Amino acid sequence: MAFTFKQFHIDDLNCGMPVSTDGVILGAWAPLAEAKNILDIGAGSGLLSLMAAQRSQGQITAVELEEKAAAACRYNMTQSPWAKRCQLVHGDIQHVCQLAQYQGYFDHIICNPPYFEHGPKASEQHRAMARHTETLGFTPLLDAISQCLSFEGYASLILPIQSLARFKACLNDTALFLVREVWVKSVENKAANRALLLLSKTEVEPYQRTDLTIRGEDGNYTEQMIELTKDFYLKL
């Protein structure tokens, strides 16, 4: 499919995971305005990279392992207004983060990690890779973030609520700290099903915990959601 946002276009036809509300929320929420060097781990179609390019003046490095998704990401970047600030690295983040030029280099890292920990795998390999944590589990992901993130930098992620406890257990074994957490409800008066997380190498006490509701009971976007995404969605 193809998606047109206010300032860029995404073709995600050959990507394992298509453009999603999760990705848009994460890209709009992450505090990117002051970032100079931004890393997008598991970039897929390049949605987060291009949102980061729109919201900052920084240099964007997207890392994507799956071949078809990497090709789509490269194409979407070259067609965007920020092609000169975006680069794609086709490879494994665990290898990329060991390269000397990337260690401690990025002042912001964004990632919408694989989210199906259990259950049947998708039939197509590239879709399965995008959706299952077996390709990039929480521990190697956090190791990569720890290696690539600058001391004063931040990492922004979105996870299913049911994965949160396991993620936090893995986080406890790193030098990273949770400094902000937003529980996301799809609909008002329903339980939260996603969490936005902001990580840092510096501990903040107490960390901030807030809520975001996407739609009201009438099915329309809430004022929170409109304010968050109005620079991207065409009809807002």
Curated annotation (Swiss-Prot):
Superkingdom assignment: Bacteria
Signal peptide: none
Any single biological process term in GO: tRNA processing
CDD domains attached to this UniProt entry: AdoMet_MTases (cd02440)
InterPro entries: DNA_methylase_N6_adenine_CS (IPR002052), SAM-dependent_MTases_sf (IPR029063), Small_mtfrase_dom (IPR007848), tRNA_Adenine-N(6)_MTase (IPR050210), tRNA_adenine-N6_MeTrfase (IPR022882)
Entry annotated with the keyword Cell cycle: no
A single MF term (Gene Ontology): nucleic acid binding
Keywords for the protein's UniProt record, in alphabetical order: Cytoplasm, Methyltransferase, S-adenosyl-L-methionine, Transferase, tRNA processing
Cellular compartments annotated: Cytoplasm
E.C. number(s) listed in UniProt: 2.1.1.223
Reactions catalysed, as given in the entry: adenosine(37) in tRNA1(Val) + S-adenosyl-L-methionine = N(6)-methyladenosine(37) in tRNA1(Val) + S-adenosyl-L-homocysteine + H(+)
PROSITE patterns cross-referenced by the UniProt entry: N6_MTASE
Any one GO cellular component localisation term in the record: cytoplasm
Main location, first listed in the record: cytoplasm
UniProt similarity note: Belongs to the methyltransferase superfamily. tRNA (adenine-N(6)-)-methyltransferase family.
UniProt cross-references to HAMAP family, sorted A to Z: tRNA_methyltr_YfiC (MF_01872)
Summary of the function given for this chain in its UniProt record: Specifically methylates the adenine in position 37 of tRNA(1)(Val) (anticodon cmo5UAC).
Protein name as it appears in the record: tRNA1(Val) (adenine(37)-N6)-methyltransferase
Organism for this UniProt entry: Shewanella sp. (strain MR-7)
